[in-house]
Structure formats: structure tokens, C-alpha cells
Amino acid sequence: MPPVLILLTLLLPLGAGAEEIIGGHVVKPHSRPYMAFVKSVDIEGNRRYCGGFLVQDDFVLTAAHCRNRTMTVTLGAHNIKAKEETQQIIPVAKAIPHPDYNATAFFSDIMLLKLESKAKRTKAVRPLKLPRPNARVKPGDVCSVAGWGSRSINDTKASARLREAQLVIQEDEECKKRFRHYTETTEICAGDLKKIKTPFKGDSGGPLVCDNKAYGLLAYAKNRTISSGVFTKIVHFLPWISRNMKLL
């Protein structure tokens, strides 16, 4: 299978191009009610898409590198290209990236989106729980990541329907070998070296879900690598998340 050609030398922010979940499967419609589709437009009118998840009725968590001038969130979607009755499209009132976010090394790649209005909870729209402060995932644990994206590395068209892939949590030492800027305090890496089944060049900000809780946010992948991805470790940022949601 030919390698994916990427412009950046070492690391690629996952939201920089077409959204892709490599491998995986289409999920049952509206079975992931926490998923958010984040659409943004920059000052030149260029559109960008990211993933995210509903953490509270009026807050969505996503990656900081998804920030843009104008942003809207679609909740309750399965087929993002269709006008589904379950969908709720809500403008973003304020984007709050973490103050320590570093765009070069992707440190603290996490952002809260305060919605202009509260989402209405339905069977298709529900928040996802966060882990407890002392909760941890360990190497070998199987988690999942979902998003709207391509079905293979040769497919340039985004999938209209929500897809999900199962990923295995990797050893921190192995992650450090693969990712130059990897920091175990604030990051988790997950994937499967034996299978092409991982997020790659898109779906930034989508949750790494383990035991029905969000343990990570999809951040970046290594150049020419489709076997693993790095996720911002949500547990580390719980105080910041809680503090900012209370302030707004």
C-alpha cells in the first residue's frame, strides 16, 4: 500500500486536511450522541472541519489547533451531508484554547467551545462523561475514536456517515520513539502497528473513548505513519476544563 504523502516534515496536525478515519466501520446511526462536527471559516473564507464532543449542554471540547474566525457546531448528526431532523446546528459564542497551547509541538492541544445556546438533549444528543481525576488508561487497553472521514488512505472523498475505529493504548516509551515531542504527562498515543486502523489526517478534536468516558482528544500523527496517533490527555486538564466552564 503506497505511503501517504504529507507536506510537513515530521508532524501533521490532524485537522489540516481532509478528515479521515482509516479503517473502522460505520456506526449505528446516532449511537454516539456526544459527537460534534465542528465547522469553521477563516478570514479568507476557507472552510475547515474538526471533530469534538459535547461535554456539557453548552460546551464542546475539541483540539486547540481547530480554532478559527467563525465556528459552528453540529450535534445529533450521523450523515453529516444530509439534513437530518436530529441535527442541532449551534454557533460558537466563544472559543477558549488552553493558554499553554503550542502550535509547533502541539502541547496542550485542547480547546473549549462555549455555544451560543444550550443543546437540547435527545436520544441523538447527549454529553460524554469525563474520567475521574485519578483515572488512567494503560497499555493494551482497547479504546475507540470516531469521525466523519475517508474509508482508506487512497480515498480522497470524506465519508458522509460517522465511522469508528478501535485503537490499542501504546507504551509511553514506544510513543517517545515515534513522536519527537511526545509528553507522557499530557498525551496518550494509541493505534495498532499490525493493522491500518487509525485516525490520520483529520478528525482533530474527536474523543478517545475508553469505558464510555473521554480520555483523550485527537491531536496529531507522525509523517508517513498510519499506525498510531497522539491524543491530548484529558485527565491532566480537568481542573482547567472545570474552572472555565464555571466562569462562562
Swiss-Prot record:
Q: Where in the cell is it found?
A: Cytolytic granule
Q: Where is the active site?
A: H65, D109, S204
Which residues are tagged as glycosylated in the record?
Answer: N68, N102, N154, N223
Task: State the GO CC annotations.
Answer: cytolytic granule
Q: Which GO terms describe its biological process?
A: killing of cells of another organism; proteolysis
Provide the GO MF annotations for this entry: serine-type endopeptidase activity
Disulphide bonds in the chain? C50-C66, C143-C210, C175-C189
The record's listing under Pfam families reads: Trypsin
By its UniProt entry, which PROSITE patterns does this protein fall under? TRYPSIN_DOM (PS50240), TRYPSIN_HIS (PS00134), TRYPSIN_SER (PS00135)
Peptidase S1 domain segment(s): 21-246
Is-annotated flag, keyword Hydrolase?
Answer: yes
| Enzyme Commission number, as recorded | 3.4.21.-
UniProt keyword annotations, A-Z: Cytolysis, Disulfide bond, Glycoprotein, Hydrolase, Lysosome, Protease, Serine protease, Signal, Zymogen
- Give the propeptide positions: 19-20
Q: Which SUPFAM superfamilies match?
A: Trypsin-like serine proteases
Q: Which Gene3D superfamilies match?
A: Trypsin-like serine proteases (2.40.10.10)
The cross-references to InterPro entries, in alphabetical order and at most eight, read: Peptidase_S1_PA, Peptidase_S1_PA_chymotrypsin, Peptidase_S1A, Trypsin_dom, TRYPSIN_HIS, TRYPSIN_SER
Q: Major place of localization? A: other
Leader peptide range in chain numbering: 1-18
Function description: This enzyme is probably necessary for target cell lysis in cell-mediated immune responses.
Record-stated family: Belongs to the peptidase S1 family. Granzyme subfamily.
- Know the name of this protein? Granzyme E
Q: Corresponding gene?
A: Gzme
